[in-house]
Amino acid sequence: MSDPHSFLGCVRRGLRFDMFKDVARQYPVIFCIFTVMISSTIILNQYLHILMVFWSFLAGVITFYCSLSPEYLLPNILISIKTKRKPQEQHELFPLGHSCAVCGKNQCKRHRPTLLLENYQPWLNLKVPSKVDASISEVLELVLENFVYPWYRDITDDEACVDELRQTIRFFAAVLAHRAQRVDVPSVVMDKMMKAAMKHIEIIAKAQQKVRNTDGLEQAALAEYGADLHVALRSRKDELLYLRKLTELLFPYVMPPKATDCRSLALLIREVMTGSVFLPIMDFVADPDTVNHMVLIFIDDSPPEPVTDPPSTLVPFLERFADPRTKKSSVLKLDLKEIREQQDLLFRFMSFLKEEGAVHVLQFCLTVEEFNDRILCPDLSDDEKQRLHEEVKKIYETYCLEESIDKISFDPFIIEEIHSIAEGPYTGVVKLQTMRCLFEAYEHVLCLLEKVFTPMFCHSDEYFRHLLCGAESPARNSKLNRNTSKRGESFGISRIGSKIKGVFKSSTMEGAMLPQYAMIEGEDDTVEEAVMVFEDDSPGPMDAVGTPGTLRNLSAWTISIPYVDFYDDEVKKERIPVFCIDVERNDRKNVGHETESWSVYRKYVEFYVLESKLTEFHGPFQDAQLPSKRIIGPKNYEFLSSKRGEFEEYLQKLLHHPELSNSQLLADFLSPFSMESQFRDKMLPDVNLGKIFKSVPGKLIKEKGQNLEPFIQSFFSSCESPKPKPSRPELTILSPTAENNKKLFNELYRNNANLPEGLEKKHNQNYFMELMEVDGAYDYMMYIGRVVFRMPDWLHHLLSGVRILLKRTLEAYVGHYFQYKLEQIMEEHRLVSLVTLLRDAVFCESTEERSPEDKQRRAKQTFEEMMNYLPDIVGKCIGEEAKYDGVKMLFNTIQQPLLNKQMTYVLLDIAIQELFPELSKNQKQGLSVSTRWM
């Protein structure tokens, strides 16, 4: 016998109780009145003649209300068609709509977004039919074969770089597929895209009134657009620049985390995708012959061809395409076993996990390994069982509880079984010897470490710092002594040359090697030996900043610059304003030390010396930068006071930067016992005009006119500001093929609108949109009938009256019909056909193009099908001549290539904003100029 709950569920679905619930929630008063009336009619059916009076009164009230309230619309009367609700907006931190890979929470604030498995591997749980996957793979293979391999094979036969490019392309395609699944396509098309189409039709209608034939329609419409013309239509060069800019804006969302840090890879992908893929696709889509073909497909009412082949099996998205072709393993690749076997690598791996907020993932793995070693002992005493039971409780509370900050996402059955052991008697802990829960939890975490964090570590700065600095452990370096360092001592790849010997000895850890910056004039070519800097080499008061053997954590320090004070400079014999820095150290409480505090006085220039040294060691910090240094002008008390807040914020950001958490250089800057000469401004001298004017006459007297000309030239050169460094090389080609000019300039589009640069146009008025808001398929139908087909006034008034009764019903039907058509297009054999057409359009350039006669034949067929698509009753209502003129106008509209391209880019902007709503919140200037009237 079936379950009564399932039977009631079937009855509920059959009677559509959910629909009645929605109606009751939306119209509570009307629903209550109708419920009372229907109940009274059923119960008191012998008094039906009396109840008819109330039914008539109710019908009259509703009719009178609807007549006096044109804004009121009757709900959809097609019960079988239910409007699809838009998906709720996903949390910005997790754009793919999945929970955190570590703790499982959907709004995790602890872990970084890169920890999201679907963000790092978006093809997870994404499967497509094998035929569709093969078609897409074929197109992507042609992209590589035509635009990458021709020049790459001249450099090397190694496929490693192309394999990385394959992974990046797979990532890009998977992100688009995931985001497309979240978009309510019928709603977007019927709302935003149809509004854009109505605007386009309005422009065409106004332009047609100004020309006598279709030859000048395109130019008149472009002029009518005015400033609303899409920026990509100004010229072919602007079109290419727009696609480049759009591609760069999408890089952070469609490429793997930190992939854009590699500028060369980003430029390569941008140029290949922009010039060789996106531009030909836009040309293909806007081609009138292509538009005619799409119109024929859409209005074709013939039944679809029966599918002869059975559905193909589902396969992981682009898995075969992304399979590495090279058989050689990278020498830089690591696995988790190698990391754990080397103490220094393990230390750096833990530092990396700390930056990612995932140290507890590795800690869980180590804890379970130790726990398994103990619980698998055959003879366990009661004391050992109690201790193991306490450990199980701790594991559950730390890694399984929802409110725990170290929660790891496990399957529910794992959490339930661990919970049952933790809450049960301690003797039940031996069940874990045979239960699957702990073993599967361990396998899950181990897979997380091996498949996600280990590859991320191999691409991290921490790992490459290990490769550069060798295998010396920072903890072991801190035990060395300055006197034991010998000239010429180096490690790792720092043996390459003596000129860079001191650079690779630097590190941010305690006991790092810092190069000597005090350079003697005239010895620019010499390379000084690096000096070991230790806090414990200083006298007793140095203990306030560091303790031998204790790892420093600058992120636990707090600083402030409360005021600006004066300092007596014994050399210059004057009082100099300095910043007073109050420092509080709180990172040694776990070893028994109380909070320590002191004050440090630093000059204005010393901050810039610190920034220069940190930049040389670690590169620039984009989130922590000093304001521009004042070179000429007084640096008095008032000036320093105005900069106090900015300098304080700069130091606070440095302290919280993970890479500087144990920086010796930053600790010395905040220490009152650092070397006096360490932050002198010899590397950043101020421009002293007085010294220049005093020194030049002396040099001229000393030279006595000898070699005066080269001296004056060198003097002028020294007074000029340094020339700016050349910017990053910018690729300006489409692709390394001979077809560049053909793709950028062709006979169909020529130079697009061919507008001169800097031309400003005023916005044209929109007479229709200012009078009435057009919303929904019913309003679009009325607008097209009024503007395109010039329907008579009586029909317009009739449709306006019927609008109250049928607007929502018609729009529900149109949405349902569009969804049905979309599902037909998304069928396997049709998707394969569409991808094949795209492949032929982009890559089959050597084959014969369609002849003008073929295009003319298709255009004629399109016009005839458009005429036949409208029912005969339309011609009877508006007249056959008006019907012919309206269809002719719509047909002429899609025969203009530049107008098609304008519409294509407008629709592209809408699609991009729907796929990537983050761009709408942080919309950059120039992304879209066509959304003003949407």
Swiss-Prot record:
Pfam families: Nexin_C, PX, PXA, RGS. It is a multi-pass membrane protein. Keywords: Cell projection, Endosome, Lysosome, Membrane, Transmembrane, Transmembrane helix. SMART domains: PX (SM00312), PXA (SM00313), RGS (SM00315). Disruption phenotype: Loss of neural tissue volume: neuronal cell death is associated with impaired autophagic degradation. GO terms for cellular component: dendrite; late endosome; late endosome membrane; lysosomal membrane; lysosome. InterPro entries: Phox_assoc, PX_dom, PX_dom_sf, RGS, RGS_sf, RGS_subdomain_2, SNX14_PX, SNX14_RGS. GO terms for molecular function: phosphatidylinositol binding; phosphatidylinositol-3,5-bisphosphate binding. Residues 335-467 form the RGS domain. Belongs to the sorting nexin family. This is Sorting nexin-14. The chain crosses the membrane at residues 27-47, 48-68. The keyword rRNA-binding does not apply. Residues 557-677 form the PX domain. The keyword Disulfide bond does not apply. Residues 129-303 form the PXA domain. GO terms for biological process: autophagosome maturation; autophagy; cerebellar Purkinje cell layer development; hindbrain development. It is found in: Lysosome membrane; Late endosome membrane; Cell projection, Dendrite. Plays a role in maintaining normal neuronal excitability and synaptic transmission. May be involved in several stages of intracellular trafficking. Required for autophagosome clearance, possibly by mediating the fusion of lysosomes with autophagosomes. Binds phosphatidylinositol 3,5-bisphosphate (PtdIns(3,5)P2), a key component of late endosomes/lysosomes. Does not bind phosphatidylinositol 3-phosphate (PtdIns(3P)).
